[in-house]
From Swiss-Prot:
InterPro entries membership: NAD(P)-bd_dom_sf, Sc_DH/Rdtase_CS, SDR_fam, VLCFA-Steroid_DH
Positions contributing to NADP(+) binding: 51-80
Organism: Arabidopsis thaliana (Mouse-ear cress)
Pathway involvement of the protein, from the record: Lipid metabolism; fatty acid biosynthesis
Major site of localization recorded for this protein: endoplasmic reticulum
Phenotype of null mutants: Embryo lethal when homozygote.
Entry keywords, A to Z: Endoplasmic reticulum, Fatty acid biosynthesis, Fatty acid metabolism, Lipid biosynthesis, Lipid metabolism, Membrane, NADP, Oxidoreductase, Transmembrane, Transmembrane helix
Protein residues bound to substrate: S191
Protein name according to UniProt: Very-long-chain 3-oxoacyl-CoA reductase 1
One of the record's GO molecular function terms: acetoacetyl-CoA reductase activity
Membrane topology field: Single-pass membrane protein
Tissue: Expressed in green siliques, flowers, inflorescence stems, leaves and roots.
Amino acid sequence: MEICTYFKSQPTWLLILFVLGSISIFKFIFTLLRSFYIYFLRPSKNLRRYGSWAIITGPTDGIGKAFAFQLAQKGLNLILVARNPDKLKDVSDSIRSKYSQTQILTVVMDFSGDIDEGVKRIKESIEGLDVGILINNAGMSYPYAKYFHEVDEELINNLIKINVEGTTKVTQAVLPNMLKRKKGAIINMGSGAAALIPSYPFYSVYAGAKTYVDQFTKCLHVEYKKSGIDVQCQVPLYVATKMTKIRRASFLVASPEGYAKAALRFVGYEAQCTPYWPHALMGAVVSALPESVFESFNIKRCLQIRKKGLQKDSMKKE
């Protein structure tokens, strides 16, 4: 009763502030507990329930290679798709030496070349197989930060062709097989550059292409969820790979192996996710900052990358 009397004696504006503050605190605590459950307690799906075969594009280096080893460890057979036959053989031999029971098929496909011919080979390779998982990992970025007017036509074409057209057409080739069996999982590799930060200056075409992948995936997630197909876009930030040109992993920079292990725990859940929890933490910090503050920092960082890239280019010419 005393509490009720106390509240009644307070001005209306103070009561409104109290209610709004309580809601904000409750929302923060709920988000924190939910995130803890998702990243540390939620069980992963049994990936073999989708099927016994998995397709991975871009499996010869970095994240794609780590995905291949993780899936082989979980007992799935692999169809590896990349442009370099020698690298495909090397990664296949490495996987077989560690997981001798794994069946591996390879498809040579240049995503910057004749995509339709490559897609035709993929269709032929999956005929009669219960392909349950597709990981659209093949992608490319800029060699270094550039103003949009400095980006040459070849780079623009390749960025769109590999990141957009390749992902779209490979998905369209594999999806009918999954629909027949009414089960499957499609994982498209997006980027935090398109989903976790306000803008990604000096990488505009790359960010735009990955934004397409993100929205494309969300639409497919809604279209095919009732058909038993789980479609997901994963949006990491920094991973130590050749594409990012980051050599060493750290707390905020995932190793390919660390990322792939975390990523597979998220398959079958959200339409969009950031599996490596330090990346999600970075995204939360960025979203809490005023856009102008983050953009000021990011522009300085990108201009430093651009300066180093131009210096390397000039040294090559000499």
